[in-house]
Amino acid sequence: MNSNTTPRVARRITSPAVAPPGIPLPTDDAPIPAHRYYTPPPRPLASCERQRSGEAPALALTTDTSFHNIVTMTSGHGGVGLSVMASMLAWTLARREHSCALIDADFVAGCLDLLLGVEREPGLRFSQVDAPLGRIEGDAMNHELMMWEGVRVLPYDPWSARQPDWWEVQAAIRALAETNDVVIVDAGQGGLIETVPDLRSGMQVIAAELSVMGLARAKSHRSRLDSWGCEAPHIVGVEPRGAPRGRSHVGIGEAQDYLTATVLGPVKPSVNLCGDVLEGLGIRSVLLITQYNPCSGKCATSHSGLDELQAAYLSSLWEA
């Protein structure tokens, strides 16, 4: 063999593998599965791939709940005064020596801590809630919440990039329901109700503006709650703010005829409270006086409406 001769390479000849009868041999182009001794974590979904309310996970539709101390408050549109009404209901129940938690589940608007004037207080926000196993210790969570007039508050900061998943919302509600007498949830226009079981099974309260448009929206909103299997709601009528002088709002009797349901209230607007909220001072006008009547814009509440709503809630607890 000289330098121009190609060296011979010894080839190793193997006999073809013999497979047991009935089991085909793998082909060369077939991928060989990798051996894994763990379950790989799921790929994070993009915001466009996340399941919407119409595609709720099966677990969200079958989970049962035994809690009867959850109040879900919603409205057919924004600007009715729902957040102040929820806050004042929590405040009045706390004054009656009920331990109360107030949850901001309005992930579109949020800012309940700003509304109450406690945005600088240290405490847990909804964007910081982490429940990887769908479970949160209630006592531990209670101690991490900020306090407002004896009410524990779990606000949502909408400027945060992280929006809680439905099971984290469910876990937070259940944790606080286990350790408080009452849990009041400001659910905005109800975007989470279909996917969060405890929001559907709780006592439903609708804030309805006493105007033609407001009542039409309230009727549509009530139909939506009915389609999700919620119990019959308690409807609270709220007088519209900023109505021209000489033009009256829709009366309670007319509202009841249109909605074919009992309407509590009316809740009257408060100019002083509206000014405090718009200036970022929180709900202080109501707390400084005995006869409170919150409302306007994102505010609302009257002595009459709150008394009736409290009575309805306490009677429902007695029946439960």
Model-derived features with residue positions:
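Walker A/P-loop phosphate-binding motif and the immediately C-terminal alpha-helix
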Residues: 64-116, 176
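Acidic-aromatic/histidine active-site loop/patch
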Residues: 1-70, 119-137, 223-237, 253-258, ...
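Well-ordered beta-strand positions
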Residues: 182, 202-204, 234, 261, ...
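Cytosolic-facing regulatory segments adjacent to core modules
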Residues: 135-148, 152-190, 195
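Phosphate-binding loop that captures ATP/GTP phosphates
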Residues: 93-152
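Inter-motif core of Ras-like GTPase G domains
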Residues: 178, 191-212
